Amino acid sequence: MKKKIYEGSSKILYSAEEDFLLIMAFSDKAILETGETVDISGKGVLNNNISSFLMDKLEMIGIENHFIEKINMREQLIQYVEVFPIQVIISSVACSRFVKEFGMDEGYVFDKPIIDFKVRSREFKYPIVNEYQILNFGWLTRDEIKAVKEQALRIYDFLSGLFIGVGIRLVECKLEFGRVFNGEESIIMLTDEISPDNCRLWHINSNEKLGFELLEKEPNKVFESYQLIADRLKEK
């Protein structure tokens, strides 16, 4: 019997038979801004398919990530990673906090993608944290911060091109990284997932919102939206 190690808002981690491997299961849960949890039937299956596909694509261009293989409709086998206590947010278009905090027009396109770091803590509501704080808190070394930024931008550039190819704009995405030790050396590795749960996706022509942004106002369209994204990616 699998031993549950951790349960988050939309995924559950279980132990695997081999050391340093885990099983990651995608659930149908979603959390609203109010903190209420809702179920979107079938969402976990679609996210497993989408994330598996995108992680495979990233592996092909040399991005080390924790994905090993898809086990079944909801589960995948992953490498154990010592996850950094930060999220890396990359934005190429004004949305969300850029509109609320800076008064920018939604949809304004930045000259270059902007990187933000947030503390990976729902309890503290994911506060923004800067590089100096990350360094002084001992969370990452200077070289690790540099490597994470370089990888994040490379990932974002690749995913943006891939989504444009299927008529979708990648407006923003949230990435997580960590360390995998190889003797005395460590490797920076992409972890978590890449799916409509952590990517802000819009129709490229109409700017119609897709994915998690529909949860609050049009929850009845969420599954249909995730399915559209999965179907478009099948074309690749």
Swiss-Prot record:
Record key words, sorted: ATP-binding, Ligase, Nucleotide-binding, Purine biosynthesis
GO molecular function terms listed in the Swiss-Prot or TrEMBL record: ATP binding; phosphoribosylaminoimidazolesuccinocarboxamide synthase activity
Domain of life: Bacteria
EC number: 6.3.2.6
UniProt keyword Secreted present: no
InterPro entries associated with the record: SAICAR_synt/ADE2_N, SAICAR_synt_PurC, SAICAR_synthetase
Pathway annotation: Purine metabolism; IMP biosynthesis via de novo pathway; 5-amino-1-(5-phospho-D-ribosyl)imidazole-4-carboxamide from 5-amino-1-(5-phospho-D-ribosyl)imidazole-4-carboxylate: step 1/2
GO cellular component terms listed in the entry, alphabetical order: cytosol
Catalytic activity: 5-amino-1-(5-phospho-D-ribosyl)imidazole-4-carboxylate + L-aspartate + ATP = (2S)-2-[5-amino-1-(5-phospho-beta-D-ribosyl)imidazole-4-carboxamido]succinate + ADP + phosphate + 2 H(+)
SUPFAM superfamilies in the record: SAICAR synthase-like (SSF56104)
GO annotation (BP), single: 'de novo' IMP biosynthetic process
Pfam families reported for this sequence: SAICAR_synt (PF01259)
Keyword Endoplasmic reticulum: no
Family: Belongs to the SAICAR synthetase family.
PANTHER family linked: MULTIFUNCTIONAL PROTEIN ADE2, SI:DKEY-6E2.2
Name this polypeptide is given: Phosphoribosylaminoimidazole-succinocarboxamide synthase
